[in-house]
Amino acid sequence: MSNIDNLTSRIIKDAEDKKRIILSEAEEKKSKIIAKKQEKAASEEKIIIEKAETEAVAREERIISSAELQARNEKLKSKQTVISKVFETTIEELCNASSDDFKGFVKTVILNSTLAGDENLILNEQGKKMIDSDFVAELNREIGSKGNITLSDKTGNFKGGFILEKNGIEINNTFEALVSSLKDEMGLEVARVLFS
């Protein structure tokens, strides 16, 4: 019986030893798997954090860029408003010219133009108060032999200046048209003077 006890004891001891080895190997595998998973999780966490930081920086740059663009556009819009106001003020000042200054303007433009001499002079309501048939007669005398400009009965719908019309063709010398043509040419110069 002692052999059986020894054999049983040895089998139990061998089983215990195998159990310890198996449990030790399982614990080692478990530790390796956990360490590997923790390493992978840390690596993925690092990648996710780096990606989030990169996206945050890119988003911040986009927001700043958008804000700068919007500010630049608002500034440009304000400058364009100021420039437009300058040209509108110029038209108003021309419209408020004295009768003598307005007559001088009409005379200078007509005498320096290449005309047939028989055009109709179209004025707005204010212009009709300043220019009369005596002025037109004097103008025709200065033009010379081809001078036959007539004062039109038609009242122009414009702020100031005048229109010369013949056979449906108009030469537009209104202040609005003259300032508008200068606006394209002088817009940059006006901006330079105003905003430098």
Swiss-Prot record:
Keywords, comma-separated and alphabetical: ATP synthesis, Hydrogen ion transport, Ion transport, Transport
Any one Gene Ontology BP term: proton motive force-driven plasma membrane ATP synthesis
SUPFAM superfamilies tied to this protein: V-type ATPase subunit E-like
Domain of life: Bacteria
Cellular-component GO terms for this entry: proton-transporting two-sector ATPase complex, catalytic domain
GO molecular function list: ATP binding; proton-transporting ATP synthase activity, rotational mechanism; proton-transporting ATPase activity, rotational mechanism
InterPro entries: ATPase_V1_Esu
Pfam families on file: vATP-synt_E (PF01991)
Biological role: Produces ATP from ADP in the presence of a proton gradient across the membrane.
Family designation: Belongs to the V-ATPase E subunit family.
Protein name: V-type proton ATPase subunit E
GN (gene name): atpE
